């Protein structure tokens, strides 16, 4: 069984749905990327263009995002494709209005890696934007509904970035919908990082039970009513677990 590293997203998945973790990370049956995730990638491309080029018009940044979206969804069968595409211009605009006052980022998509004592594999990730000159980093999230505070899985993710970029870093998350935006400062970084570490330790203990992927099928049982098993994932789950 091949396993080389953790990521905040995989560890959050391990917490949220052990069986989906088995399907994707142990069995290698990755689910098709849906329109929401593709939209997030495209919006980030447009926003990065606008941040790195302060004189670029909003329209040109939107064009970058739409071209990216059209490219990565060209073969997508997601019926929501056009609906999500239509929200990209407003999301790019919202995010740039929020983040351009920070200036030009010193880093984009900066790789971070952490391997604390007791872990066999490192936890790695890529932070979206860092302004070294301000001691600030921001992770950008696209969403349908604006949250009133930082979501816990996102807090764990950004705590990793913050801890790997300096003791006094001001870590923030910016959420954007087509009509609203908000930026929240991450607090309790050490506590969230500790939680991520503990989840990783339990994940490795789970993986250490066997080198045989079939073992994890025999010892787990998916809840197919969970939203994790919507769409094609449910049929794949039926085939893998046999019920």
Predicted segments with their positions:
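Short, surface-exposed beta-strand-loop junctions and turns on beta-sheet-rich folds
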Residues: 29, 144-146, 179-180
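Metal-dependent nuclease catalytic cores that hydrolyze phosphodiester bonds in DNA/RNA
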Residues: 1-126, 233, 238-243
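Residue-level recognition of conserved beta-strand positions in structured domain cores
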Residues: 25, 140-142, 173-175
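Flexible, glycine- and charge-enriched loops at secondary-structure boundaries
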Residues: 36, 147-154, 186-189, 193
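Metal-dependent nuclease catalytic regions and adjoining charged, substrate-binding loops involved
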Residues: 165-243
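Non-catalytic protein-protein interaction segments used by genome-maintenance enzymes to assemble
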Residues: 112-158, 163-164
């Amino acid at each position: 069984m091949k396993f080389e590293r953790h990521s905040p997203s995989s560890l959050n998945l391990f917490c949220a749905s052990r069986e989906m973790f088995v399907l994707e990370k142990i069995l290698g049956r990755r689910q098709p990327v849906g329109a929401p995730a593709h939209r997030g990638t495209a919006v980030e491309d447009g926003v990065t263009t606008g941040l790195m080029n302060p004189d670029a018009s909003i329209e040109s940044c939107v064009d970058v995002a739409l071209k990216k979206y059209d490219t990565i969804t060209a073969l997508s069968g997601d019926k929501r494709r056009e609906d999500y595409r239509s929200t990209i211009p407003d999301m790019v605009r919202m995010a740039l209005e929020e983040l351009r006052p920070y200036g030009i980022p010193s880093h984009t998509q900066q790789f971070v890696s952490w391997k604390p004592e007791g872990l066999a594999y490192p936890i790695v990730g890529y932070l979206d934007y860092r302004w070294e000159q301000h001691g600030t980093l921001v992770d950008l999230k696209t969403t349908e509904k604006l949250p009133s505070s930082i979501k816990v899985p996102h807090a764990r993710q950004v705590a990793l970035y913050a801890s790997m970029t300096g003791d006094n870093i001001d870590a923030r998350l910016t959420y954007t919908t087509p009509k609203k935006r908000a930026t929240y400062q991450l607090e309790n970084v050490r506590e969230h990082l500790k939680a991520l570490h503990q989840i990783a330790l339990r994940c490795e203990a789970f993986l250490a039970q066997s080198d045989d992927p079939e073992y994890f099928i025999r010892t787990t049982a998916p809840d197919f009513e969970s939203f994790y098993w919507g769409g094609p994932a449910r049929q794949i789950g039926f085939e893998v677990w046999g019920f």
